Amino acid sequence: MKKNILLLFLVHGANYLFPFIVLPYQTRILSIETFADVAKIQAAVMLLSLIVNYGYNLSSTRAIARAVSQAEINKIYSETLIVKLLLATICLALGCVHLMYVKEYSLIYPFIISSIYLYGSALFATWLFQGLEKMKAVVIATTIAKLTGVILTFILVKSPNDIVAALFTQNIGMFISGIISIYLVRKNKYATVICFRLKNIIVSLKEAWPFFLSLAATSVYTYFNVILLSFYAGDYVVANFNAADKLRMAAQGLLIPIGQAVFPRLSKLEGYEYSSKLKIYAIRYAIFGVCISAGLVFLGPMLTTIYLGKEYSLSGEYLQSMFLLPATISISTILSQWMLIPQGKEKILSRIYILGAIVHLLYAFPLVYYYGAWGMVISILFTEVLIVLFMLKAVK
């Protein structure tokens, strides 16, 4: 498992390190207005990608890990791949219809360009590689793709209004990852696309539904925040908040590879072996989350000033105020992915996330209306803590 954790660190290192390199270039080249528009479109694409993934990144990972034959793996792979491609097409259509409805015609073409992320997400079989514990393939695909996106950013993004180029370079990496993923699956014969039945697809959708509800609910207090903030705040505030949130997510992203590597391992264990391993992993994971939070407190303002430039001076204050999030998220991951899901309590987890999303919206709108980005920070923190409390009650 240590090897898989290391490989997942490399994957998420590529996911966060390369954009981390690009971000200061974009904040200095793009105008505040363009950077804010990029943030809004990218947030919308991330929301739609949750529909594309539809919880399969967890349900299919677990199914692959428990599969007892190659035929079963082929069946899971085929059904998941086809459904995700169909969902990507539906999301593209819905996004275009929405932009036409709100008369944001100038953003339709940039959105279509950004939708390559949706198809890349559909093709990129991370769930297959995780279930098989073959993470080397993911590292190869992600590293090549992200590096390509970085190089293209410095080549194509040249003027303050290069919104299409900025969005293309941000999203092409996922599409390339998807293509490489398909190639590696075929080359190494990890799985084969076979004929499938509509009945089986419906069953797989039902199995992934609780995971989807959980992810969709969490998106309300993650990706939707930038969109909500744009309703009440100007481009300057939106751009600064988005930049701070990207840095916070990059720091918080250090937790993801450990969480993903431990999840399939714990899913296979039962009884005393499960309990003893869980205790060891949980203590170390929580300590790591606290260390990341401490880093935001002491290094946040200094990093943003050097990294983003003087125009983004507010970002440092926003980032520092989010310091509790990494520690809280580490506890949330332990309770949800390592405890509730392996115990078969997916429905309870879904209800917790849905309740958290509903409550979040109740106070997020008025707080953002009166206090802008500070109201958003307060809303996010309160929601994450509230969800952890709900989870603690559920695992007892």
Swiss-Prot record:
Pathway it works in: Bacterial outer membrane biogenesis; LPS O-antigen biosynthesis
Keyword hit for GTP-binding: no
GO BP annotations listed: O antigen biosynthetic process
Positions of transmembrane segments: 5-25, 32-52, 82-102, 107-127, 137-157, 163-183, 211-231, 286-306, 322-342, 348-368, 372-392
Superkingdom of source: Bacteria
GO cellular component, one term: plasma membrane
InterPro entries cross-referenced by the UniProt entry: Poly_Biosynth_Transport, Polysacc_synth
Cystine pairings recorded for this chain: none
A Pfam family this chain is assigned to: Polysacc_synt
Topological relation to the membrane, as annotated: Multi-pass membrane protein
Keyword match Zinc-finger: no
Localization (cell): Cell inner membrane
Chief location category: membrane
Keywords, comma-separated and alphabetical: Cell inner membrane, Cell membrane, Lipopolysaccharide biosynthesis, Membrane, Transmembrane, Transmembrane helix, Transport
Reported function: May be involved in the translocation process of the nascent O-polysaccharide molecules and/or its ligation to lipid A core units.
Family to which this protein belongs: Belongs to the polysaccharide synthase family.
Protein name (record): Putative O-antigen transporter
